[in-house]
Amino acid sequence: MMQLSGRRLPLAEIAQVALAREPVEIAAAAKKAISASRGVVEEIVARRAIVYGVSTGFGKLADVHIPSDKLEQLQVNLVRSHSCGIGRPLSAPEVRAMMLLRANVLTLGFSGIRLEVIQLLVGMLNKNVCPVIPEKGSVGASGDLAPLAHLALSLLGEGEAFFNGERMASASALEKAGLQPTDLRAKEGLALLNGTQAMHAVGGLALFRAKRLSRVADVAGAMSLEALKGTPVAFDERIHNARPHPGQRAVARHLLALLRESEIRDSHAKDDPRVQDAYSLRCMPQVHGAVRGALGHCEEILAIESGSATDNPLVFTDNGDVLSGGNFHGAPLALAFDYAAIATTDLMSISERRIDRLTNPDLNEGLPAFLAQHPGMQSGFMIAHVAAVALLNEAKVLAHPASVDNLPTSAGKEDHVSMGMTGALKLRTIVEDAENVLAIELLAAAEGLEFRRPLKAGVGVERAFTTLRGIAPRVDEDRALSTDIERVAEAIRNGQFDGGDDRL
């Protein structure tokens, strides 16, 4: 049972709730902070003070003062009017991550929301009630307004939700789960809507997958190196100690472990006329390592965000101040997602170059053209490489940063926005493309190893080869490879090619 207290949540813990449905609960200490924060708001309402988000309109309409008898309707109107998302619904894991992240930051006690509203959100999460949240419509400032509005709408028993995978009216989903919808009181609608948790959920789960891919790339690259009769000399620790980037050194160690006890290497270690391998093989530590470093940096940013108050205004219980600021602005995440997208695309790029070397008879060290047993009669992996190129092209287009764009909204009041949700959605697509490109490389490299038999590759490579052959058999004759690619990509997502005991 995960305790929610506003602490930082690592990606692995978010994934555990989003994917494995680990239950959560609000920590006892957090309940006190929540109640104290709510007390400040109720005191403001009691003395009829003019405070943004409590007794005023929103955005450009912040100068409009709302009568005290209309404060609850104001919050309901906010949720309904902002529920204008567009497109396909976010996946259940993405919505679950979004609910987790929003509940966690609300427990910090800066939002002035009642404990029972957060408890309903947690109850929905634990009982698998997932609001239907369209994926498009957020510019990432003032937070993810439209997606979070759809989330809040379900708490009211309005809109739609999935219950155990079945789409229905939110009121029905809550009833089936044994939950009651809530009302909204002063500031509570705004407390639910102001935040970065939609982009955080989508981009965070994509980043979790990208970090896994950065390890899978080592496995695929090591297998390709063996199939191409490459050398591990470039991974010697002395080289990498001379340029001690942590990711580079870790990848070099990982590759050496994967390639340990290679019979293929022993067969050509002496008197090999080749001096050094191509960059796509020789520079794996430098490239894969840089990707690891980039993704690690992005993960640190998301960890900070997971325990940060992104509401506006913020309630401070030590002296009762309610201060307007801009913590809802998604710039930190938007820049991180763009960085992760570029890094993941580069990982795809070097993988595609290795696929080309495996299939190109002028470069593949004696392997048959396109890895076909009877080239000409058979086309082998010719079009599998073309598919990888198509995916890489899409990723390169999507790697253009979303965060450098800006369009003012709310009649110029909100004149700079992050476009973080766009960045998160792009990253998700790029990661999916990368999973498929690495699946193609694994399939092609395994096929190359078949032509090196009876010699065995390194112990780590052989383990990965055995795993792959449990998913996709050798291509003895031409067949449709789409199913093989899909199955291997799914195995990548499930962690079957992370590197086993050789993971570093």
Which residues does each PLM region occupy?
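C-terminal auxiliary extensions adjacent to catalytic cores
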Residues: 1-22, 26-33, 37-45, 67, ...
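Conserved, non-catalytic sequence blocks in retroelement Pol enzymes and Pol-derived host proteins
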Residues: 110, 139-141, 376
